[in-house]
Amino acid sequence: MEELAKKYQNLQTELSTYVESLKKLETQLQENTTVLNELEKVAPDSNIYKQIGPTLVKQSHEEAKTNVKTRLDFINKEIARLENQTKISQEEFSKVKGAIIQAQAAAAPPNPAS
């Protein structure tokens, strides 16, 4: 029973971590989508600057778009991976929860007959 309780807590923590990570990735996805939309509106010969630390570095329009698209691809893949991990953990969580309920039912004293 103790082992099941530990596993239950670990899975609960794992699921919370996945949910937090998914929220962060969704925010990054939204931000990068907005950046890409803004880059689409800008003329190809416009000056684009990328902040690297405290410095602004000039970047070509095409290079900026390519970098943002690459980031978006990566973020989408990470979201898919985490969603899959979350699903697997939720299934395991349900199994452990069921096992705990069964163990508690087996350990409970029988009801006296009326």
Curated annotation (Swiss-Prot):
Disulfide bonds: none annotated. Pfam families: Prefoldin_2. The keyword Transmembrane does not apply. Keywords: Chaperone. It comes from the Eukaryota. SUPFAM superfamilies: Prefoldin (SSF46579). GO terms for molecular function: protein-folding chaperone binding; unfolded protein binding. GO terms for biological process: chaperone-mediated protein complex assembly; protein folding; tubulin complex assembly. Belongs to the prefoldin subunit beta family. Heterohexamer of two PFD-alpha type and four PFD-beta type subunits. PANTHER family: PREFOLDIN SUBUNIT 6. Binds specifically to cytosolic chaperonin (c-CPN) and transfers target proteins to it. Binds to nascent polypeptide chain and promotes folding in an environment in which there are many competing pathways for nonnative proteins. This is Probable prefoldin subunit 6. It comes from Schizosaccharomyces pombe (strain 972 / ATCC 24843) (Fission yeast). The lineage of its organism: Eukaryota, Fungi, Dikarya, Ascomycota, Taphrinomycotina.
